[in-house]
Amino acid sequence: MATILFKVIMMKELILLEEGWSVMKTGVAKLQRILEDLSEPPFDPGQYINLYTIIYDMCLQQPPNDYSQELYNKYRGVVDHYNKETVLPSMRERHGEYMLRELVKRWANHKILVRWLSRFCFYLDRFYVARRGLPTLNDVGFTSFHDLVYQEIQSEAKDVLLALIHKEREGEQIDRTLVKNVIDVYCGNGVGQMVIYEEDFESFLLQDTASYYSRKASRWSQEDSCPDYMLKAEECLKLEKERVTNYLHSTTEPKLVEKVQNELLVVVAKQLIENEHSGCLALLRDDKMGDLSRMYRLYRLIPQGLEPIADLFKQHVTAEGNALIKQAADAATNQDASASQVLVRKEIELHDKYMVYVDECFQKHSLFHKLLKEAFEVFCNKTVAGASSAEILATYCDNILKTRGGSEKLSDEATEITLEKVVNLLVYISDKDLFAEFYRKKQARRLLFDRSGIMKEVTDITLARELQTNFVDYLSANMTTKLGIDFTVTVLTTGFWPSYKTTDLNLPTEMVNCVEAFKVFYGTKTNSRRLSWIYSLGTCHILGKFEKKTMELVVSTYQAAVLLLFNNAERLSYTEISEQLNLSHEDLVRLLHSLSCLKYKILIKEPMSRTISKTDTFEFNSKFTDKMRKIRVPLPPMDERKKVVEDVDKDRRYAIDAALVRIMKSRKVLAHQQLVSECVEHLSKMFKPDIKMIKKRIEDLINRDYLERDTENANTFKYVA
């Protein structure tokens, strides 16, 4: 039995252009009545679907009845007609704030109009417009408003906006919401770009701002003191930033602030900062820290704005320091034996005072640190009654350590704090080697004559040895379990020895047991003292079992802590070592570098390089060997500083000789002036070499055949290998 299938094609009724568009016109008219608040009910779903379907069907009809292009043109015509016949007349009959309110209303209505018309014509926009590469219906709609409405209104709107902003600057209340909404019209007409906003409004705002604050600066600078002027300037900057927050576009802020800063601060900077009665020097003189902080805040964001303030700061500190030197010199002339000691105390007080200024008023800015240093270098290197600053400082330290502050009888902590402050001053002394020599001699005198405070440095060693003997006896009598390692502790008294860096090192178990045992023992001797462990001074002898032989390694406590980790793991990452030992990155890099990158490579580092990074891994180098069975694995010092232990002049001659030879060995051939300059630079950290002395040392090195003059140019020297 055969089955017959019938295919039925339903043909839609053809919609002519005018017929279909008449339906659309009805919908457009309804939409416009809604926008004009003419009590028109909203679209119901059926009406919306009907309008959408009309456009859809007219776009799908076969040519020549495909009316896509015609509908696209009519869409443009509808929007243009509405803007010309309805929007523009309503705008033209209003002025001032009323015009702005109408502009905001019409812009909001226009966005609604475009959104609804685009929804009705969605199929047209989605396919026909996209295929032809035409401007979207949204773009067509907004271009119409821009060309027909915005272009005619924007200039007047700009003038009204600027007038409102001027009123607010003068203290009047304005409708900020209205201003913000109008600004949104400028931004919205850029269609995602800020060019229109910047050219049509922002540029005029910036010009107006500059003119306004130029007038204010001229009047205020004549009427107000520097502190009062700065208060007003700070308030103006705050209010301008609030304006950006309240109604301007965020991109305007840096430009607006720059204009205000330029007119209120940059243009009048010299007049303001150098004001004789209330400027920077007057604020420093009167200790007006709040005003100085404000001056710093105002000028810190201006390029080179802080330089004149910092220069005056240096000038003021230098003047105060020179006054102290003069007072001390006058007192010394009057046979006041304590003049130099009083000078150091006052210099310390001066340094403490202005360090507070640098930290609090100037937020630790490097420029103020630099110029404070330069100021102190000026007067801290002057002589008083024939005594150099190096000798005066050394004598002050000697008196503190001998008499513990004289009549004040300083505590251990106060003594240490005072000495730290002296060290702060020592940074500014050019002849540090001279200070070291004076200090060494005075220290020897204290020890020889059994003066109180410093003798602790000697007696501590004796007491520490006795304490160690008692500890050994204690272990023999009380410990049922042996510690497993020989453990020696040297106990020193805080306050009479140099301070050392302490860390919260996580000790290996082997060491922890020893430390805890000593703590228990020490608790039986005293319960009023606290032990602070200085691991950086410790030394460990550990056995390394390598493939070829077992070797004794002499290492620091830190190095030992690292190596002992590899008893429990064949391979460890940098992060694992760091977490287990609880060491800083700087300390751990130094340790791992000493064990894997220098002469004795106890550890193998991957990847192989001369630097340590946080991604490196390490493993025990079982193949390591050396001809010696006992080796000392050096740990590079944190800071190497040349110490002068003999006569200063002789030491300087040796230092200059060494510097000259080192420079010439590196450079081979060098002109006289360049050699002298490099030598001065090379030695300036410890002292300022005398130019005449350098010339004499060059001649001496020539006589000893280290250097020779160039045969063609007597002012050029050659290194003799």
UniProtKB/Swiss-Prot annotation:
One of the GO BP terms on file: ubiquitin-dependent protein catabolic process
Gene3D superfamilies: Cullin Repeats, Cullin, Chain C, Domain 2, Winged helix-like DNA-binding domain superfamily/Winged helix DNA-binding domain
Pfam families per record: Cullin, Cullin_Nedd8
Span of domain Cullin neddylation: 651-713
Domain of life: Eukaryota
InterPro entries listed in its UniProt record: Cullin, Cullin_homology, Cullin_homology_sf, Cullin_N, Cullin_neddylation_domain, Cullin_repeat-like_dom_sf, WH-like_DNA-bd_sf, WH_DNA-bd_sf
GO molecular function terms noted in the UniProt entry: ubiquitin protein ligase binding
Database matches in SMART domains: CULLIN, Cullin_Nedd8
Family membership: Belongs to the cullin family.
PANTHER family: CULLIN
Protein name according to UniProt: Putative cullin-like protein 1
Species this protein is from: Arabidopsis thaliana
